[in-house]
């Protein structure tokens, strides 16, 4: 019925593509004109396009700025509205420039890298520019397609980001497109973990693989510089973490990202759907890890799993469970049965009358639940691997290891205890965001993938992104065979082995896709027993990933890969000549770095000839054959695996092998129904495969159920995270306003005055009191401004006989005087130090700048400390909110209500922290600055006493000599006395963080020549402060 309806209404996707034909015709008509231009004229075209863009947007932009002139742009809602209107203005101008810009990039690409964009690639570029998702089959050139909208949107001068799934793909993609952009006068940046670079054709990276021109021209630069490039390539993790780090900095110049203007997400389904449930978290150490993790890991061993489900007990089909615990495979949760609970209570030696879930044992249940999950739900070589004594999570969708990622809420510690590796201390969340909310902050977002249409509903509902299927340049001729279905995994793996051998014997390359490390090693061991050479690519070995995948199309090659989704490297029939050059050079007795130009040319020609000969042989044999060892939870990941074969019109085929013992079938399949079908169709031979449309539908139905379940979970995550996301936007917008503000004094004074007004009402104008409590009011006033205690007698006289409102006015006046006096005193002290050649705070060069810096630090410190506490509290609220369902309340509604109440408390806590700390911390700074003065005077006196220059003045002392491989800095503890004092020696490694808290390494900051005196002053301040804290 639906197919008939589709024919009647027409294919909406075809209509979208057809609408782009006039634009495509315009682009093609410009091709002869572009070909006639010289290289220099092509480059000049970029500047011309930028000028035209500025002219096209000028009037509307000025009108927009005028309308928002009186608005608070630091308000996240106002800024969003502004950016929406600005996007309409800019997109209208870019749409007008699109044909010329695309034609320009096409011509530059043809000249620089020898690749001309096909018409279908132009259509893909238009889709991406419009902020949609382009579904493009494997081998259709997504990297090249992205160059078109990246260039066009970079014309606006606000940056354009290309986001990929791993560092290698980002580096290769940027290095391949970099020459195109460079020829057109645009810069390309690259960000990775602890590394950032700019594409520079005149720079050669000595550490890069020299035979790959895409990797050698990355010149290291600051992260800020990489983001300021016209286009920036990087991974989703790096962009997200940089955003979080930017919202934790203490100085504006420490921010690295600019506005989130335009982004293209490669493998968009992987990043925005598969990883949507995994939040990015920056955490810091909390308390030391508890011994209870090891204790409970030992206690939970040896429990028996129940084969009876709660449904069977609830429906009366079974009397009781037959084990100690049962597992809900769908939600991956584990629950103790009554017998299991009794076992655990005995093992814990709980007193009679006590049980695990008594309030006093609440903490123990946390360890118990995590230990049970670690022991029985999370499996080694499936959910994680152990590498170098560490538990490393394996991405369930891509099969990649995720170093640095840790499960939260103690689960990671429980797994570490299970594996008998070091149990690391637990963490507290400092900042967090989900990919869903990070990418929704971009003004415009596009995406590319080979498989998106099955998730079109989710892309539309959560990200407001439409999926458009881009036609292939050549027709796909791959043959997708029906699934082979078996009752047992043993029979299935035997069939997989037979099929691999059959394909190998006729010279066809085979790619075996598995869903876990465990299953990939099962296949690998079967092949070893048969003596068949093969490559194994899983979470344990991905260093040579790109090379292995690139050569997977060679004659008779056998490659086993865990979840091919997102691998990002094309499998070329016959192999990739680039990867064979080193082999031929080795045969010539040389290497890539030592080869002569003649040897290099000979190796390249030989590799190309070998590949071409193999390509013909492989194509005649039938091309690449794909084997899936089981169906994935999502149909699109199956499609991604299939899509590795049959690229750009090449021959190929695919088949999936399934058993009823596969995880998908046990968790989501209706096993009883499928078993009955199989019994009717089989003759009892387990080794005989079954092919049936009914069975195929049953399996597809299981996949549809799991897709629906996972969509609901992700929607659930985003609904909850949206609450915190709005609050995060408010907090981060406030931080940005503070970082960019020159003077926060008025705002701080306003907070102080508000607090005084509260206490006026509480102590002086409170009808519940018998009489005004002036003493109580003064206590609060002195706790806010301790400096006023010195004026106690004078203030008592001024307040005597006054009404509440008059006292409030006098108190406000007195506080403002104290504030101004404090600013003047700190300014005088800071000026004195500057005159003596010491700058206690790097980058703060004047007395006014110092006081403004101090005010900002007070406000940022209050926000950050309270926000960290709030994140912990709101996470605990979220974990426990499910209990309200018992009281028949909607958990989401209850969570929103409580979270908004907590957020109001957070704002009040921030204000209180600023109000009650500001004057106290300022007084401490006065003490610290005076201490630095005394330290300097003591060192000067010491130098004179020790026979220094007779003409010694109050200039800064000579710098201490630097040691080899590090530095020793001596800080006197003389505290103003001229006599020799005990010295404190602080050793700082060249690569250690600089003690000035700039975030830079020591060697690049105060380890530079001429910075010694300044460093001594900083260390003196820190030392004095540490002493002061100790005394408190």
From Swiss-Prot:
Annotated transmembrane regions: none
Keywords on record: ATP-binding, Cell membrane, Cytoplasm, Membrane, Metal-binding, Nucleotide-binding, Protein transport, Translocase, Translocation, Transport, Zinc
Cofactor: Zn(2+)
Pfam family, one: SecA_SW
Name this protein carries in UniProt: Protein translocase subunit SecA
Annotated binding of ATP, by residue: 121, 139-143, 570
EC number: 7.4.2.8
Family, per entry: Belongs to the SecA family.
Organism from which the protein derives: Herpetosiphon aurantiacus (strain ATCC 23779 / DSM 785 / 114-95)
Single GO MF descriptor: protein-exporting ATPase activity
Enzyme class, spelled out: translocase
Function: Part of the Sec protein translocase complex. Interacts with the SecYEG preprotein conducting channel. Has a central role in coupling the hydrolysis of ATP to the transfer of proteins into and across the cell membrane, serving as an ATP-driven molecular motor driving the stepwise translocation of polypeptide chains across the membrane.
Gene name per UniProt: secA
Record's catalysed reaction(s): ATP + H2O + cellular proteinSide 1 = ADP + phosphate + cellular proteinSide 2
NCBIfam families: PRK12904.1, secA
Residues reported in the UniProt entry to bind Zn(2+): 994, 996, 1005-1006
Subunit (UniProt): Monomer and homodimer. Part of the essential Sec protein translocation apparatus which comprises SecA, SecYEG and auxiliary proteins SecDF. Other proteins may also be involved.
SMART domains found in the cross-reference section: SecA_DEAD, SecA_PP_bind
């Amino acid at each position: 019925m639906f197919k008939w309806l589709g024919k009647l209404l027409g294919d909406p996707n075809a209509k979208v593509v057809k609408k782009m034909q006039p634009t495509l015709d315009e682009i093609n008509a410009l091709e002869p004109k572009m070909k006639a231009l010289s290289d220099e004229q092509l480059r000049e075209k970029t500047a011309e396009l930028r000028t035209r863009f500025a002219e096209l947007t000028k009037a509307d932009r000025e009108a927009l700025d005028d309308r928002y002139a009186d608005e608070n742009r630091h308000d996240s809602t106002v800024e969003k509205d502004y950016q929406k209107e600005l996007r309409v203005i800019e997109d209208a101008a870019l749409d007008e420039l699109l044909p010329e810009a695309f034609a320009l990039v096409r011509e530059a690409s043809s000249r620089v890298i020898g690749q001309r964009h096909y018409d279908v690639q132009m259509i893909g570029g238009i889709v991406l520019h419009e902020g949609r998702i382009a579904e493009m089959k494997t081998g259709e050139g997504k990297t090249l397609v992205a160059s078109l909208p990246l260039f066009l949107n970079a014309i606006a001068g606000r940056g354009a980001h290309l986001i990929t799934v791993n560092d290698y793909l980002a580096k290769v993609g940027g290095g391949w497109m970099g020459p195109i952009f460079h020829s057109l006068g645009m810069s390309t940046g690259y960000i990775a973990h602890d590394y950032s670079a700019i594409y520079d054709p005149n720079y050669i990276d000595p550490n890069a693989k020299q035979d790959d021109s895409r990797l050698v021209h990355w010149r290291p630069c600051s992260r800020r510089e990489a983001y300021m490039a016209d286009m920036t390539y990087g991974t989703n993790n790096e962009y997200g973490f940089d955003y979080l780090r930017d919202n934790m900095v203490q100085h504006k110049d420490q921010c690295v990202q600019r506005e989130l203007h335009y982004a293209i997400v490669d493998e968009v389904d992987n990043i925005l759907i598969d990883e949507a449930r995994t939040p990015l978290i920056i955490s810091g150490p909390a308390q030391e890890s508890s011994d209870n993790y090891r204790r409970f890991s030992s206690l939970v061993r040896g429990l028996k799993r129940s084969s009876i489900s709660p449904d069977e007990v609830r429906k009366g089909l079974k009397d009781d469970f037959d084990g100690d615990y049962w597992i809900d495979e769908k939600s991956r949760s584990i629950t103790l049965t009554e017998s299991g609970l009794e076992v655990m209570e005995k093992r814990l030696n709980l007193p009679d009358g006590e049980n695990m879930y008594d309030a006093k044992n609440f903490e123990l249940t946390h360890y118990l639940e995590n230990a049970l999950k670690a022991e029985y739900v999370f499996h080694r070589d499936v959910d994680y691997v152990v590498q170098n004594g560490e538990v490393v999570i394996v991405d369930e969708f891509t099969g990649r290891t995720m170093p640095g990622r840790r499960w939260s809420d103690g689960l990671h510690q429980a797994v570490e205890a299970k594996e008998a590796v070091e149990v690391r201390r637990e963490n507290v969340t400092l900042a967090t965001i989900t990919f869903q909310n990070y990418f929704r902050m971009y003004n415009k977002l596009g995406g590319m993938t080979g498989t998106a249409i099955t998730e079109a509903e989710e892309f539309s509902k959560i990200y407001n992104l439409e999926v458009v299927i881009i036609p292939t340049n050549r027709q796909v001729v791959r043959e997708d065979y029906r699934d082979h279905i078996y009752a047992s995994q043993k029979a299935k793996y035997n069939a997989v082995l037979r099929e691999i051998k059959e394909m190998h014997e006729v010279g066809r390359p085979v790619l075996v896709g598995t869903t876990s490390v465990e299953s990939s090693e099962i296949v690998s061991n079967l092949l070893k027993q048969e003596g068949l050479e093969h490559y194994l690519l899983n979470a344990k070995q991905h260093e040579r990933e790109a090379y292995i995948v690139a050569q997977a199309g060679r004659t008779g090659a056998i490659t086993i890969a865990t979840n091919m989704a997102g691998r990002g490297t094309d499998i070329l029939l016959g192999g990739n000549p680039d990867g064979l050059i080193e082999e031929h050079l080795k045969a010539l007795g040389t290497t890539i770095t030592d080869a002569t130009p003649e040897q290099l040319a000979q190796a390249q020609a030989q590799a190309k000839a070998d590949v071409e000969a193999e390509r013909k042989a492989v194509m005649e044999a039938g091309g690449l054959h794909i084997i899936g060892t089981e169906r994935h939870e999502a149909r699109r990941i199956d499609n991604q695996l299939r899509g590795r074969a049959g690229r750009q019109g090449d021959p190929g085929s695919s088949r999936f092998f399934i058993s009823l013992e596969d995880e998908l079938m046990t968790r989501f399949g209706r096993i009883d129904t499928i078993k009955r079908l199989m019994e009717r169709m089989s003759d009892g031979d387990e080794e005989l495969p079954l092919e049936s449309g009914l069975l195929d539908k049953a399996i597809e139905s299981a996949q549809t159920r799991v897709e629906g379940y996972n969509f609901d979970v992700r929607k659930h995550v985003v609904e909850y995270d949206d609450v915190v996301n709005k609050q995060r936007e408010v907090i981060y917008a406030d931080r940005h306003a503070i970082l960019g503000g020159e003077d926060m004094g008025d705002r701080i004074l306003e907070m102080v005055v508000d607090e005084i007004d509260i206490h006026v009402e509480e102590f002086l104008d409170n009808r519940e009191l018998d009489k005004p409590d002036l003493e109580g009011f003064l206590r609060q006033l002195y706790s806010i401004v301790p400096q006023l205690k010195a004026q106690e007698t004078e203030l008592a006289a001024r307040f005597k006989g006054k009404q509440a409102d008059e006292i409030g006015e006098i108190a406000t006046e007195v506080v403002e005087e104290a504030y101004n006096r404090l600013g003047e005193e700190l300014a005088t002290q800071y000026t004195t130090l500057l005159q003596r050649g010491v700058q206690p705070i790097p980058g703060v060069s004047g007395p006014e700048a110092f006081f403004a810096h101090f005010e900002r630090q007070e406000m940022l410190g209050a926000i950050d400390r309270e926000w960290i506490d709030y994140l912990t509290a709101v996470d605990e609220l979220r974990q426990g909110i499910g209990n309200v369902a018992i009281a028949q309340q909607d958990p989401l509604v209850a969570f929103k209500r409580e979270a908004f109440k907590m957020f109001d408390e957070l704002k009040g806590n921030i204000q209180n922290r600023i109000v009650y700390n500001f004057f106290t911390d300022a007084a401490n700074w006065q003490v610290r600055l005076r201490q630095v003065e005394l330290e300097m005077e003591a060192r000067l006196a010491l130098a004179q006493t020790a026979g220094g220059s007779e003409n010694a003045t109050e200039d800064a002392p000579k710098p201490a000599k630097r040691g080899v491989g590090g530095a020793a800095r001596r800080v006197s503890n003389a505290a103003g006395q001229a006599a020799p004092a005990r010295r404190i020696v602080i050793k700082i490694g060249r690569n250690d963080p600089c003690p000035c808290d700039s975030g830079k390494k020591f060697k690049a900051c105060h380890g530079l020549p001429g910075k010694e005196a300044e460093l001594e002053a900083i260390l003196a301040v820190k030392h004095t402060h540490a002493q002061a804290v100790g005394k408190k």
